[in-house]
Amino acid sequence: MGRPRAFDEEQAVRAAAELFAVRGYEGTSVDDLVTGLGVHRGSLYKVFGSKRGLYLAALRRHLDEEVLPLAAALREADGLGALLAQAVAAFDGGPAAGLLLSAAVERAGGDPEVGALVGEGLAALDGAVEQVGGNGSGTAGVLAATVLGLRLRARAGAGGPSADAVLAFAERVG
């Protein structure tokens, strides 16, 4: 009988999600993970198999605990302006909030499993926007892309329209 696990797997996945969201997959070394998670390298490999295995677990957790619940909540919004305000506020909720976007930019094109998870998250967000705003004029897709674009610009430290300006625009067209 083996020794009991010396770390909390869920906490390790949560901490890894934050590291990957802030530093990206390529910018996060196994040493960064060992230090940031407070686990031994052997334990990390035993539980997750590889850095990629931990990344997939972190992205799955991010979808299940943050993105999909957000999409469900957005479906209840009273109009596109309210939906956009809620989405912008949610994506400003901390470092792990950027993991979906980071995965989309950095890994989805070259890793089919990451691409499938990113696609699942984006489809859920798009579906919420379409349900609230309809898709007749294409406004729903534009607003979904706008929310993600705001988050991307914030990550890059770039200027651009403020969330308030986007909200004002959404009110005019919604």
Model-derived segments and spans:
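N-terminal intrinsically disordered/low-complexity leader segments
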Residues: M1-F7, E171
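Amphipathic alpha-helical segments used for helix-helix packing
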Residues: A85, D92-L122
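Short, basic, alpha-helical segments at the C-terminal edge of helix-turn-helix-like DNA-binding modules
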Residues: R60-E66
